[in-house]
């Protein structure tokens, strides 16, 4: 059994959708990024890559490569899973937290869990997604950006 940890941050900007866990969440701003900027899925992908000692998301899908422009992070996560499996491992579980002041994510968490479980090809009850604020502190508290953290376990296939 191996453990991985992932972290991602993107700025909130006008004119982009807010996509978290593969769900378009209604909000007046979205996340800036080369891909769809889904911080939750990026953190999960980095956790999986880290657990398998395969580097980070940027090494596999560089923001300098035009083919990843506006990429769907669910598709990127599926590719990460393929690479983890090719290295001889299978995802076992994921625990993730999104840090943002608003909007509230509770109405969307079940769909996020389903999307992550589908990408990882395992049961939804092996995926935990939580959301919290930073009580007005820091860049998240000032609503300048959104952060996500994820931990995962993988096991030999």
Curated annotation (Swiss-Prot):
It holds the Pfam family YgbB. A divalent metal cation binds at residues 8, 10, 42. Pathway: Isoprenoid biosynthesis; isopentenyl diphosphate biosynthesis via DXP pathway; isopentenyl diphosphate from 1-deoxy-D-xylulose 5-phosphate: step 4/6. Its cofactor is a divalent metal cation. It comes from the Bacteria. The record marks 34, 133 as: Transition state stabilizer. One of its GO terms (biological process) is terpenoid biosynthetic process. It is an enzyme of class 4 (lyase). GO terms for molecular function: 2-C-methyl-D-erythritol 2,4-cyclodiphosphate synthase activity; metal ion binding. Keywords: Isoprene biosynthesis, Lyase, Metal-binding. 4-CDP-2-C-methyl-D-erythritol 2-phosphate binds at residues 8-10, 34-35, 56-58, 61-65, 132-135, 139, 142. Its EC number is 4.6.1.12. PROSITE patterns: ISPF. It catalyses: 4-CDP-2-C-methyl-D-erythritol 2-phosphate = 2-C-methyl-D-erythritol 2,4-cyclic diphosphate + CMP. CDD domains: MECDP_synthase. The keyword Lyase applies. Binds 1 divalent metal cation per subunit. InterPro entries: MECDP_synthase, MECDP_synthase_CS, MECDP_synthase_sf. The keyword DNA damage does not apply. Belongs to the IspF family. Involved in the biosynthesis of isopentenyl diphosphate (IPP) and dimethylallyl diphosphate (DMAPP), two major building blocks of isoprenoid compounds. Catalyzes the conversion of 4-diphosphocytidyl-2-C-methyl-D-erythritol 2-phosphate (CDP-ME2P) to 2-C-methyl-D-erythritol 2,4-cyclodiphosphate (ME-CPP) with a corresponding release of cytidine 5-monophosphate (CMP). Homotrimer. This is 2-C-methyl-D-erythritol 2,4-cyclodiphosphate synthase.
